[in-house]
Amino acid sequence: MQPPSLLLLVLGLLAAPAAALVRIPLHKFTSVRRTMTELGGPVEDLIAKGPISKYAQGAPAVTGGPIPEMLRNYMDAQYYGEIGIGTPPQCFTVVFDTGSSNLWVPSIHCKLLDIACWIHHKYNSGKSSTYVKNGTSFDIHYGSGSLSGYLSQDTVSVPCKSALSGLAGIKVERQTFGEATKQPGITFIAAKFDGILGMAYPRISVNNVLPVFDNLMQQKLVEKNIFSFYLNRDPNAQPGGELMLGGTDSKYYKGPLSYLNVTRKAYWQVHMEQVDVGSSLTLCKGGCEAIVDTGTSLIVGPVDEVRELQKAIGAVPLIQGEYMIPCEKVSTLPDVTLKLGGKLYKLSSEDYTLKVSQGGKTICLSGFMGMDIPPPGGPLWILGDVFIGCYYTVFDRDQNRVGLAQATRL
């Protein structure tokens, strides 16, 4: 006969829900900025107040106080995946964004004049058996306007319909999220995604809503409280990458992971020692702070420093806030090397230039953009998809650190 303590342990393990390892395929689409540029749209109007506004302040004020401009306009977001909300799941395409902390999707009750709502999937609480009314209003400020609506609670499925896709999935119960009834400007009309799933820390969550990954952690749905991103740099590859919840996949990276401690638990913020452009220019002298952000496609830094960087790589400004590099010169340009945790992370000219179509022609754009982020949130560098595409990135909530390793070219 088994000892009672061992029997209880076995029964406990059988009764406990199995911690999952969840893979979410990511798909790469043309960004809003590129879509508007190719159509000849007024992109400069969208970026007049800065291409990114979510870093304007360090954290939102308490409920009832003024909420700062926490989220950017997502003009440069490119990688999206699918989740489900409700029972049965209603599917939505979302940006998995490590630079914000809230989940929101369009609501079936959106305003009549909200054109973006017409052309995206909408959440219908009346079709969900697990919906719980909340009703608290929420308001997220953007450079181009204000996204608003009200909070609701329901089950979130990741991915949306895992049984049909053959993927392992999890259900995060009792998740509070935003039903957007008003979306600002024209940004979301051109967007290929329905909503945003924020994966940063609770500190920057609007209305102090518990983020999806924190709720997932509390419900012990994954073995390790980590998630990792692989972004495929091949523009024609599908899927465009993979988000893994609960672990890492060594097929996506070479060598060991090197870890950086999070310096401030709001965004995924780390210390960066310096940035070298070839052997002729050093930026971030004496060290600086950087955000690792899956929701931004570019690498962003202080305006004056990035202006020097653009000059050093021969990039010239375009009216839409982008910089162009002559494609024939790309192979001759210097490496840009970021020093993080005492290790060097090199970006070749092929890594930091983006080939895009404009007016039927291929042009090359710089993967860097200048923006000054004021205190208390800034100054900051933002390491977006240009960097993450080169370095497989692990976000570790158990030990509050970010892991990096050279990404595999598949």
From Swiss-Prot:
The active site is at D97, D293. GO terms for molecular function: aspartic-type endopeptidase activity. One of its GO terms (cellular component) is extracellular space. Residues 79-405 form the Peptidase A1 domain. CDD domains: Cathepsin_D2. N- and O-glycosylated. Undergoes proteolytic cleavage and activation by ADAM30. Keywords: Aspartyl protease, Disulfide bond, Glycoprotein, Hydrolase, Lysosome, Protease, Secreted, Signal, Zymogen. Residues 1-18 form the signal peptide. Residues 19-64 form a propeptide. SUPFAM superfamilies: Acid proteases. Gene3D superfamilies: Acid Proteases. Glycans are attached at N134, N261. Acid protease active in intracellular protein breakdown. Plays a role in APP processing following cleavage and activation by ADAM30 which leads to APP degradation. Belongs to the peptidase A1 family. This is Cathepsin D.
